[in-house]
Amino acid sequence: MKTYLLFFFLLIGSGVLNFLSAQQITRYQVIKSFPIASSGGWDYIAVGPQNNRLYVSHGTQVNVLDETTGDSVGVIPNTTGVHGIAFVPSLGKGYTSNGRINTVSVFDLKTNQVLGQIAAGQNPDAIMYDEFSKLIITCNGRSSDLSLIDPVTEKVVATIPVGGKPETAVSDGMGKLYVNIEDKSEIAEVDINSRSVTNRWTLSPSEGPTGLAMDVKTRRLFAGCDKTLVIMDANNGKIIDRVTIGDGCDGVAFDPELKYVFASCGEGKLSIVHEENADKFVLAADVPTKRSARTIAEDPRTHTAFLPAAEFEKTAAPGERRPPMVPGTFQVLVVGQ
């Protein structure tokens, strides 16, 4: 018995158990898929607030699915060029960023009925709700700024220039926003009270930051760049680590209980990185998904991830940059253990 105990404690001291926790316990795989019959492109997907709903941006509408069965439970229409979805549960409202018409749609979380439209900046992309400031924030790609919207009055209360194309924003819950500036390969720190950029931190030599998530306890930022997940200290912009991931990452999610960082990569891979501690990160798994599955939402209650994807033709039509999507192939992949 003493020999076995000694070996066990040696394992702990050598860090082998941490390695096993990342490499063996992570058994994520695609467990099912939810087909969506309608046509059109897509961007972000969101898990609803305690209502067992998935909200899938899809061309000119948002498809609302039952998170467990994948059954359609509604459609939010007239969201042309929709990118993202955010929620304010206390008001019973949801919000979509409509990139092609420069608006934010307001909808009822119970009925999915559109309640109104709010003018935003140019090409609003990612959208989020900041619990600290009680504001909706949109990242406006073409006007290179953030729109801050009061969800009670449904008015834009401030616009913050960020000096580049803002792709995604996260909040530390204490008055700071962190924004991926895609065309500058940097993260901008924004003070929500002063309505200004207070720091700019380079991600170089990593390029093209898109997805962004944060561990608010360890104050680590996770930026999905070209084939690299960059881990940054949110206190000072110091690069903590760079972990190789798949190609074409456009979404990052973080599970605060399991300490997993999920990076969805369009090449057909979900890279999962384990946060051993604030300064140590290891690649736990590269889960095969489907080519085009580049964005992600993760439900921290069930530890399940959801990735929209579709099949595409092999060649592009004359004058087009990309091959067309094969009709009837749009779906949401469900990844779990």
Regions found by a protein language model. Give the residues of each.
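Predominantly soluble domains enriched in secretory-pathway, periplasmic, or organellar proteins
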Residues: 10-11, 18-337
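Cleavable N-terminal export/targeting peptides
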Residues: 6-7, 16
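Positively charged n-region of N-terminal signal peptides that target proteins for export
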Residues: 1-5
